[in-house]
Structure formats: C-alpha cells, structure tokens
Amino acid sequence: MALEFNTIGVSLKWASETTAGSRPLSGYATIPSIKGTPAIDINPNKIEVTDLSDAYRRYVDGVKDVGDSFDFTANLTAALKTAWNSCVSAATAARNASKATWFEINIPNFDSFFFAGLPTELGVNEMGVDAVIESTLHIVPNQIAGWATKST
C-alpha cells in the first residue's frame, strides 16, 4: 500500500553557492508564507524527423524546456518581503561573482527538488474586497538538478 504525501509543511528555501559550480548542501534559508508552487515539467520538446519513407510521423527528443519563470504564490507579509529582498540581493551578489543561487522545494518525510535560478524583485498582485493580499515570487530558472536528498 502506498503512503501518499500531503502539502503540510512543504517549504521553499534558497542558498547561494560558496564555490562556483557546486550546489550548496546546507545553509538554505526558508522563504515564509508560501501558498503554492509551480508545476515543473521536464518534458523535452519533440523534433519531427519523418521522411518520405515513413508511414507514421517520427520524433526525437529535443531541448528540455521548463519555462521562463517559476511562479510561487505567497501571502504578502513583512517577513516575506524581508526574506525575498534578502534572497534577491544575495542572488545578485552571487551572480556578480559568477555563482548561482539554488532553490529547494522541501517536502517533509521525502526528498527535495533543486533548481538554480534568478529571483526577480517583488511586485504587487491585484487586490479585491474581502481577500488576503498575495504576492507572486518569480524565479527565472537556469539549471535543474531535480530530486536529491534534502539540505541540512
């Protein structure tokens, strides 16, 4: 019998490389107030290679395209703003030093999913009557490590 997981306790963390080209194994800081994560689909594009001798279309795998932005939904809080601004500042400094910033989607009692990317400045989402104020955190992905043992 399979034991399914739920989303209680899922978190988004980040850490900048201390050594260029090496994903950090520890020292990740948590981004608070996350409400939703994006789907990260690692399905490669398909390139058609059919020729006139084929009765059916044929394809080969092409470039993997995970999209141009991973968008995380969060409740807008002072703690979120502070944490996100720290992440953006550290990522900018890391990039200027030719180092990457890594993100970890941490699932309790399971592995984590890792990717490197560039976080963008915090904007303002639309607002309406009788609603919580949310924010969308945008991260431009530039490397996917995938599933691995969670950070310490």
Language model features with spans:
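Short, charged, solvent-exposed linker or helix-capping segments at domain edges/interfaces
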Residues: 83-86, 148-152
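A generic structural signal for short coil/turn motifs at secondary-structure boundaries
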Residues: 81-82, 128
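Short beta-strand and beta-hairpin "edge-sheet" elements
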Residues: 104-149
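Acidic glycine-/aspartate-rich tracts in secreted/extracellular proteins
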Residues: 76-80, 144
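Short, acidic/charged, Gly/Pro-enriched secondary-structure junctions
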Residues: 82-116, 120
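Polar, enzyme-active/binding microenvironments
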Residues: 16-21, 109-110, 149-151
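Solvent-exposed edge beta-strands and adjacent loop segments
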Residues: 2-76, 116-133
